[in-house]
Amino acid sequence: MLRVPLLVLCLALSVGADYYGYGWGRNGGGGGSGGGSGSSRASASASASARANSIGNLVGRLTSLVDASASARASASANAGGFGGSGAGGSGGNGFGGGSGGSGFGGGSGGSGFGGGSGGSGFGGGSGGSGFGGGSGGSGFGGGSGGSGFGGASASASAQALASATAELQAAQDAYDQASAYAEATARAAANGGSLDSSALASAIASAEASVSARGASIIARARARAEATVRAARRSFASAQASAEASVSAVRSAEGRARSFARAVARARASARAAIAGVRSSGRAFASATARARASVSAAARAVARARAQAVARARASIRASASASARASASAAAEARAAAYARVQVAAAAAARAAASAASASASASASGSSFGSGGSGGSGNGGFGSFGASANAVANAFAQAFGGGLGNGGNGGNGNGGNGGNGGNGNGGNGGNGNGGNGGNGNGGNGGNGGNGNGGNGGNGNGGNGRNGNGGNGRNGNGGNGGNGNGRNGRGGRYYYGSSDYYY
């Protein structure tokens, strides 16, 4: 910033010294013509040459200061641009930490990359570019306008440092300008024949030199310290960013590993789900097949049960038909046998009746004398057949006749007066009723015995009238029901008996 004005000033002083003949600068003094003032001019020339040398030394120091500032600016620009970027003022390429340095003491624009950014013009950098750690106002020597950079300070601190350095340089330049103006005025006065205040000029030059040297050294020291601090901060920031980047990379790799593990787990879960679905489907098919087989088995069992039931019903019907026909045949044969037996008994009874008739004819006179009456029996075949009692003396004959003919096809005849006779045996119909016997004179009249039932019901016992009537005995039932006991004047008659084979049943 100060290089061009200082060089112009030094060139002007050197040319002026050569022009006025004071021996300042490179050419020295050529001396002057004239006689009287030779010694004074020689001393003035020597003094001016010494001053010119001092001014040259001052200019050299200022030039060194400017060069040091340029070197510091280059270093700051290199630090601001990042690692791997271009130098001060140049444009940094895209890369790990590069960026383009802009115009100014140490700033520049950093390019896009891992840690770079664009630095603006000025003492300590400008806006940072895009990248991992860059951004607007990111990278630079001491920070720039905008956001924070890779290793830079804040924009306000950089601006304050830049303003302070600029003010100090401006004060040094003002002091040097004042010294230069005073030297020119003194030189012009001496050239015009005036006196030269060498002590004042030397004092001004020394003061300017001291001021410029002190302030330049202070600026350089502060700039160096600030640059070193910035470099250390940048290195720490870079180390932190590198650690963060490595942590991020490791996190990304870990996330990728977890993602791959998750993908493998998802794949295994999908495979398991597919296997489970396949198992469920196969189980469903097996269940459907088992259900179909069970239904077929149930249908076959139902058909077998239906066939067995039909066969059992058919066998039962056939057995019932066979047993019914057998029982019918047995009943028919039994009925035929019963009819044959009854016919035989009728024949035997007829013979006995013939014999009894003869006996009855002979005994009728004695029967009339004893007060007995002859009871006429009904027809034994179809009505109330059989004979009644022939009196007390003819009970045996009457009983035999009644048993033979009393109930062939109908009921037994009624007993005559006196001791009632026994009812005839019942045939296929109902047994004959016992005759009603009248009690004898003062005797106990016995009720007639009911006839023996044939295939039908037994005859009813006769009712005994007269004295103390006894209970008539009911007829003995054969295939039918026993006859009812006769009613006496005394006790009731006893019921007949059922014959079932060889066993008796009384009621």
Curated annotation (Swiss-Prot):
Compartment(s): Secreted
UniProt entry tagged with the keyword Signal: yes
Q: In which tissues is it expressed?
A: Component of the acid-soluble and acid-insoluble organic matrix of calcified shell layers (at protein level).
Q: Which residues form a coiled coil?
A: 158-185
Coarse class of the protein's main subcellular location: secreted
Region (Disordered) location: 462-507
Gly residues bias spans:
462-498
* Entry GO CC: extracellular region
Q: Which residues form the signal peptide?
A: 1-17
Keyword annotations for this protein? Answer: Coiled coil, Secreted, Signal
Keyword Coiled coil annotated: yes
The protein here is known as: Glycine, alanine and asparagine-rich protein
Name the source organism: Haliotis asinina (Donkey's ear abalone)
Q: What is the lineage of its organism?
A: Eukaryota, Metazoa, Spiralia, Lophotrochozoa, Mollusca
